[in-house]
């Protein structure tokens, strides 16, 4: 008869804690101390005659395991693994060499951040290999993973439903923990998309009393989880609205949603990356029924920022120019919609999309051509929206090297070069209708006073054709910037106000002839 093991959380019903042989369960825990405690309580929850093996990574088992004589199996096979990826690869072979794995429960306590430097492909391959191994030997395998960013491992594992019998996370919420079950298969059936409150204290892990009778919502399509700033001080508009003070609280509430509307607020450019991670996590983990909306409270989003948020999984980005009534109309317009765009598994890929050109300022002629060509041929970027290239010819009497000294790009990805008596600029992700505004920020003087002629390319095929022509220019016709002045410039009684230097005269008293005598 096959054995059925149990997870070490008291009062859980069988459907979400039983682990029969032949399956693999993966449990993410965001704090290592909680992972160790749950590891020990799971050992203690097994029957006296159970066959259990404890695998500790990066530590000695005797330093981790803490059991009394009244709980747990009579015998526990102990194993230790070095904190190296190679140890995880060889774990299956090493276990077979040490014992007969049939009807065993293997509990692996991973070292903190053990999977951090292992890519998603290798992680999924290891899970699939472990699943085949557990099915062949008729044993159960529980992996407890602790990491600062458990979503990094959770997201790629969501597609491993054929290999994992269970996938869940335990996240610390101040005085309690959330037991977030993506799915959990047992001998009693399978349960999915459950969020349970659990407590951890000196008595161990147990289901919170109010969670024992709480009913999981079947549909939250009418629910709206919003940042309080979105309503601009107005109270909740109906019983379906729930307001939160921070985006972090909105994100944590959205983790339990299925089809609700999630409203984030953004006030400054520095929030972009974190907000993008929140949106990406919700979209990958909670599905396509969520309506995720970002409202810009103050003008802070560039075109690249908006594209990053939409690529991360946002359904809509509401600009700061939209009034509250217009904002509510836009929120209503996305109801009953399903998100259909493809979202990459790795958020780092999206960051690469938004900043593909990590250069700024002057580049040599050949380096400029190579950089622009790489951007244009990047298939991950949207077509005909990669940027604008403009060639400027100086006005009569002005050398192109002198015009270069006036060119001061501030954005990463804006580069320029000089050659063939032209100043050529490439402004990444700049729209053609914003070109004049961008040039006014780059040059301190009107471009009409500095340059006599300009040519603009904004479509991919146009820019690529011009790059081919530019690569044919002989190096002898490449211009070089003016040499920097050498020596120390000693400015007396002068201050810089951020734009130019200003000298302050020193007072000198004139003397008369009588005083000189």
Swiss-Prot record:
Keywords: Cellulose biosynthesis, Nucleotide-binding. Belongs to the BcsE family. GO terms for biological process: cellulose biosynthetic process. It comes from the Bacteria. This is Cyclic di-GMP binding protein BcsE. It comes from Klebsiella pneumoniae subsp. pneumoniae (strain ATCC 700721 / MGH 78578). InterPro entries: BcsE. Changing residue 411 to D: No longer binds c-di-GMP. Required for cellulose biosynthesis. Binds bis-(3'-5') cyclic diguanylic acid (c-di-GMP). GO terms for molecular function: cyclic-di-GMP binding. Changing residue 414 to R: No longer binds c-di-GMP. The keyword Zinc-finger does not apply. Pfam families: CBP_BcsE.
């Amino acid at each position: 008869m096959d054995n059925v093991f149990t997870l070490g959380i008291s009062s859980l019903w069988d459907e979400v804690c039983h682990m029969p042989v032949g399956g693999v369960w993966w449990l993410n825990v965001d704090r290592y101390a909680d992972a160790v405690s749950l590891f020990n309580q799971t050992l203690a929850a097994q029957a006296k005659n159970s066959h259990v093996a404890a695998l500790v990574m990066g530590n000695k088992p005797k330093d981790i395991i803490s059991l009394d004589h009244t709980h747990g199996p009579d015998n526990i096979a102990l194993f230790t693994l070095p904190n190296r990826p190679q140890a995880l690869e060889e774990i299956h072979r090493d276990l077979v060499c040490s014992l007969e794995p049939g009807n065993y429960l293997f509990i692996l306590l991973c070292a903190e951040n053990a999977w951090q430097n292992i890519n998603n492909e290798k992680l999924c391959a290891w899970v699939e290999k472990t699943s085949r191994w557990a099915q062949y030997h008729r044993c159960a395998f529980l992996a407890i993973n602790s990491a600062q960013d458990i979503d990094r491992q959770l997201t790629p594992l969501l597609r491993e439903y054929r290999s994992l019998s269970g996938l869940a996370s335990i996240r610390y919420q101040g005085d309690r923990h959330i037991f977030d079950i993506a799915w959990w298969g047992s001998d009693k059936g399978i349960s999915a998309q459950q969020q349970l409150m659990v407590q951890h204290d000196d008595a161990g892990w147990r289901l919170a009393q109010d969670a024992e009778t709480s009913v999981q919502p079947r549909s939250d399509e009418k629910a709206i989880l919003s940042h309080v700033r979105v309503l601009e001080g107005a109270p909740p508009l109906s019983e379906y609205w729930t307001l939160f003070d921070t985006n972090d609280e909105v994100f944590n509430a959205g983790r339990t949603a299925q089809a609700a509307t999630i409203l984030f607020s953004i006030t400054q450019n520095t929030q972009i990356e974190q907000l993008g991670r929140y949106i990406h996590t919700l979209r990958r983990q909670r599905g396509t029924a969520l309506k995720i909306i970002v409202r810009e409270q103050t003008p802070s989003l560039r075109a690249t920022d908006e594209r990053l948020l939409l690529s991360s999984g946002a359904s809509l980005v509401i600009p700061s120019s939209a009034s509250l009534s217009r904002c509510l109309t836009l929120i209503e317009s996305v109801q009953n919609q399903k998100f259909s765009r493809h979202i990459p598994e790795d958020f780092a890929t999206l960051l690469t999309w938004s900043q593909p050109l990590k250069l700024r300022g002057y580049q040599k002629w050949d380096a400029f051509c190579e950089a622009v060509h790489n951007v244009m041929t990047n298939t991950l970027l949207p077509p005909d929206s990669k940027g604008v290239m403009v060639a400027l010819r100086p006005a009569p009497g002005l050398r192109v090297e002198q015009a270069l000294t006036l060119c001061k790009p501030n954005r990463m990805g804006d580069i320029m070069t000089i050659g063939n008596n032209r100043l050529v600029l490439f402004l990444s992700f700049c729209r053609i209708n914003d070109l004049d505004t961008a040039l006014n920020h780059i040059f301190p003087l009107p471009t009409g006073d500095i340059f006599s002629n300009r040519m603009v390319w904004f479509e991919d095929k146009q820019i690529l054709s011009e790059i081919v022509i530019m690569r044919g220019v002989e190096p002898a016709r490449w211009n070089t910037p003016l040499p920097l002045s050498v020596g120390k410039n000693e400015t007396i009684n002068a201050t810089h106000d951020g734009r130019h230097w200003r000298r302050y005269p020193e007072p000198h008293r004139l003397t008369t002839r009588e005083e000189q005598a």
